Amino acid sequence: MSTEEKLYTPSEWSKRYRSEELISRFLIFAVNVTKKARNATKCLLDIPYGPTERSKYDIYGIDLPNDAPIFIFIHGGYWQELSKDFAGFAVPVLVANKIKVIPIGYDLCPNVKIQDIICQIKVAIETILSSAVDSGCRCVWICGHSAGAHLAAALLHDTKWIECMTERGYFPLIKGLLLAGGIYNLGPLTNTSYNEALKLSEDDIRELSFSILDTKGNNPIKNLKVIATVGECDSPVFINETREYAQKIMSFVDNVEYILLRDNIDHFDIVENLLDAEFVLTRLILKYMNV
């Protein structure tokens, strides 16, 4: 494995297990957690927001009051793996605290480009927000993990979309973004095996590398908190990019917080630990969603 490949392979940096075992354990754990959440929680699965098989989302906590807060989760997998079937970590604690949880599914590379996925995420969120406004929902937070953090961050850089969502009364409902273990500069990925599916062009890199975009023309975003967080046992590149991206968006987002999670937190247990009501990110979610 080349040095660059290792830097962009977060499983190589955990102190818990070797890379292959870590990924295997994560996948098994994620599937089991999601299955248990579906069995233990009143939910609606596979709600379509688009025409493709993967353009669906799930709603956990359908028996909660109409005005219950909503926590949207966007899974990772380098834009080319996983699905919402691996995305149930936040469900038990949040639903127990009267927060609905909505994991979003989306199409994967190489069948689509990253830009297509971003468009899907926007459509999904618009659909969810429309329903949330109609039901009197109190607030919405959006969480993205790994590549999902990049997809969530994309919302901040589409001023036309924000303006449209604001005019329709949707955007003010979003009170926060939680970006966990994200990647925000895609250029170096062209030197890794991940690009075989991504097929990034130079234009793609310029458009999608949010940490190096020119944001001078971005309108200020008020009344929105962004938490950019990463574990200390994630890849050094992911740690640096998270810190740099947090600094970048401070130029137009009024409330930004960078959190480096200690205690050997890595790229995977940063979301696994959402099962724990006392985990720092879980406590922050509950705090900011007014629970």
Tell what function each PLM region has.
Residues 67-77:
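Short beta-strand element of the alpha/beta-hydrolase
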Residues 171-175, 217-226, 252-254:
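Short, proline-enriched alpha-helix->beta-strand connector loops that line the catalytic pocket
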Residues 227-235:
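Conserved strand-to-loop "acid loop" that flanks and positions the catalytic carboxylate
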Residues 85-102:
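Short amphipathic alpha-helix adjacent to the substrate-entry channel of hydrolases
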Residues 2-65:
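N-terminal cap/lid segment of alpha/beta-hydrolase-fold proteins
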Residues 229, 239-246, 250-291:
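C-terminal catalytic histidine-bearing segment of alpha/beta-hydrolase fold enzymes
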Residues 126-192:
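Primarily recognizes the serine-hydrolase "nucleophile elbow" in alpha/beta-hydrolase
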